[in-house]
Regions:
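Hydrophobic beta-strand-centered segment that forms part of the acyl-chain substrate-binding groove
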Residues: 88-120, 125
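HotDog/MaoC-like acyl-thioester-processing domains
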Residues: 1-8, 17, 113-115, 126-157
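Intrinsic-disorder/low-complexity, polar/charged segments enriched in Ser/Thr/Lys/Arg/Asp/Glu/Gln
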Residues: 54-60, 104, 118-120, 134, ...
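Residue-level recognition of well-ordered beta-strand positions that form the cores
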Residues: 62-64, 106-108, 122-124, 138, ...
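A conserved, well-ordered hydrophobic junction motif at loop->secondary-structure transitions
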Residues: 60-84
Length: 157
């Protein structure tokens, strides 16, 4: 399922343009629904109340970076890699009807990301505290973890 992009984000130069590749990124929403059981004591006997909740929040996309994203010859530029992490994590929040802005973002680089070869970006919600949301993401190419990131976002309303 494609992730919905809020109306006020439709002009984003990263999300709505071919910033990393020849066409805009199409983030896919991935979620697992699980039935959670809550126990409440009612009149001296236990009753189980079942409720369905989304327990995993994840967004992913596959792209083939072009020379638009090139830094050193044949290698994706580090700032653009970080931008890709930021975009994926934001779309993970969009998946969960949260509009937010980046507060902090830390990227780690494990292996160079080759231009012209498919990569997969995955972002996952970790937790929220009040209006701050914690997320993490990873970029995998040829089965190798090439880059990882952690971020905090602040709800915009």
């Amino acid at each position: 399922m494609k992730v919905f992009i809020p109306h006020n984000h439709r002009r984003c130069q990263v999300c709505s343009q071919g910033f990393f590749a020849d066409s805009p990124i199409c983030f896919e929403a991935v979620g697992e629904r699980e039935t959670l059981v809550n126990h409440k004591a009612l009149a001296n006997h236990e009753a189980s109340i079942k409720s369905e909740a989304l327990v995993k929040y994840e967004t992913r996309a596959k792209i083939v970076p072009t020379d638009k994203a090139e830094g050193y010859d044949g290698i994706m530029q580090g700032g653009i890699v970080t931008t890709l992490h930021d975009s994926a994590m934001l779309h993970c929040l969009f998946q969960n009807s949260i509009t937010a802005m980046t507060v902090s973002l830390t990227s780690r680089f494990h292996h160079p990301i080759a231009i012209g070869k498919e990569l997969e970006i995955r972002a996952q919600w970790v937790k929220s505290r009040r209006s701050i949301h914690f997320l993490e993401s990873k970029i995998i190419q040829n089965g190798k973890l090439c880059s990882s990131a952690q971020s905090q976002f602040m709800s915009s309303h």
